[in-house]
């Protein structure tokens, strides 16, 4: 997918950068959601009514007022209705800028991050900063559903093709949760691989799992950000399968101390953040 937009030309992705020695909110860089939504025809009216980009930030550190380093892990929920998503490398550089800066306590850091991220995204952002004790007991979790990956099929094309979903439903009405660990796309700017687990929960006509798997695999050489891929999958399923209810949720592997987990639904509440085996 080729995008031509001035907002992408200024991004730090793919460029040599220096790490800031002191806290700097100006390091954050926005990417307009309209960049992808215009092409999908959903800039004004999205088919999903609930959603967030759920980030886990593992590399957070700052100094307390006595100069002693502090560490934490953050859960960050960026509302789908925000004007912008946040470019991941700029997010990493921003978080690194806290390393040698003094803050009074956890709450001061959390409030600072929430303010800065909300301003960059031009929308609602929730930040929960967790001390290490919270994550010491966190288990490796999984997304519930039937895995569609173990099918004995031959794949010869890895170019994105939404037409794999054409005529993908039967007349049987079901409620299903389907999982694939084979979602792989590429960064829009750097072409680096993005590896994810895809979760689909729907109510409606039964979706043919072979067609769905071929569609998922077709993302393998596709270039878009994580958030854009999930919105594309949601729109394609609504167009071809026309379910009564739909949730699309992807959890991507960690890069640069961050994992990004976009969630879009027209009927389910936002999930609690969790951690999969590959995260």
From Swiss-Prot:
Domain of life: Bacteria
Binding site residues for NADPH: 88-89, 255-256
Top EC class of this enzyme: oxidoreductase
GO BP, one annotated term: tRNA modification
One MF term in the entry's GO annotations: preQ1 synthase activity
Reactions performed catalytically: 7-aminomethyl-7-carbaguanine + 2 NADP(+) = 7-cyano-7-deazaguanine + 2 NADPH + 3 H(+)
Gene3D superfamilies on file: 3.30.1130.10
Subcellular location per the Swiss-Prot or TrEMBL entry: Cytoplasm
Alphabetic keyword roster: Cytoplasm, NADP, Oxidoreductase, Queuosine biosynthesis
UniProt keyword ATP-binding present: no
Disulfide bonding pattern of the chain: none
EC number: 1.7.1.13
Biological function: Catalyzes the NADPH-dependent reduction of 7-cyano-7-deazaguanine (preQ0) to 7-aminomethyl-7-deazaguanine (preQ1).
PANTHER family: NADPH-DEPENDENT 7-CYANO-7-DEAZAGUANINE REDUCTASE
Name of the protein in question: NADPH-dependent 7-cyano-7-deazaguanine reductase
